[in-house]
Amino acid sequence: MNFLLSWIHWGLAALLYFHNAKVLQAAPAQGDGDRQQGEVISFLTVYERSACRPVETMVDIFQEYPDEVEYIFKPSCVALMRCGGCCNDEALECVPTEVYNVTMEIMKLKPFQSQHIHPMSFQQHSKCECRPKKEVRIRQENHCEPCSERRKHLYKQDPLTCKCSCKFTDSRCKSKQLELNERTCRCEKPRR
């Protein structure tokens, strides 16, 4: 069902795209410099800009080189092309499928000791795609057997370990003047 809805969704988007192709050719490729304040941006433009694709992103150098804490970098961040945007499905994430390295000259300062311009390598993303999120892949790979054929509603299951445990807690049972039977996962009358 989700597959069919996805195809319909993309079909409508393609139809809108081709229908408004002339409008897009006239629109600026990046930025809103030519737009008037208060002007409404068309759905197709908004949709296209939100798609999963490489976008210029400011990246903190310490994020890329976390072990070089003894230095101060100038500039402290660099503009890199990185995957960004929406995948229109919460089970998917925008990830790079093609990358390359770029070398930039960065000033490395060691307080009260030295400073020099040093070539540093950074990864840029050239192609991006929507792919299943890691936790979704793990859950799909580790498909668990059900806890119990009978009385499934009484159990909860950890999707990572497949361990089954009682859905009800002892405190919940006690609030009803009952006791939790851990073998059956039911709240029962206390034995006397």
From Swiss-Prot:
It is found in: Secreted. One of its GO terms (cellular component) is membrane. Glycans are attached at N101. One of its GO terms (molecular function) is heparin binding. The keyword Disulfide bond applies. Residues 1-26 form the signal peptide. It comes from the Eukaryota. Expressed by the venom gland, and probably other tissues. GO terms for biological process: cell differentiation; induction of positive chemotaxis; positive regulation of angiogenesis; positive regulation of cell division; positive regulation of endothelial cell proliferation; positive regulation of focal adhesion assembly; positive regulation of mast cell chemotaxis; positive regulation of peptidyl-tyrosine phosphorylation. Keywords: Angiogenesis, Developmental protein, Differentiation, Disulfide bond, Glycoprotein, Growth factor, Heparin-binding, Mitogen, Secreted, Signal. Disulfide bonds join C52-C94, C83-C128, C87-C130. Belongs to the PDGF/VEGF growth factor family. Homodimer; disulfide-linked. Also found as heterodimer with PGF Interacts with FLT1/VEGFR1 and KDR/VEGFR2 receptors, heparan sulfate and heparin. Growth factor active in angiogenesis, vasculogenesis and endothelial cell growth. Induces endothelial cell proliferation, promotes cell migration, inhibits apoptosis and induces permeabilization of blood vessels. This is Vascular endothelial growth factor A. It comes from Vipera ammodytes ammodytes (Western sand viper).
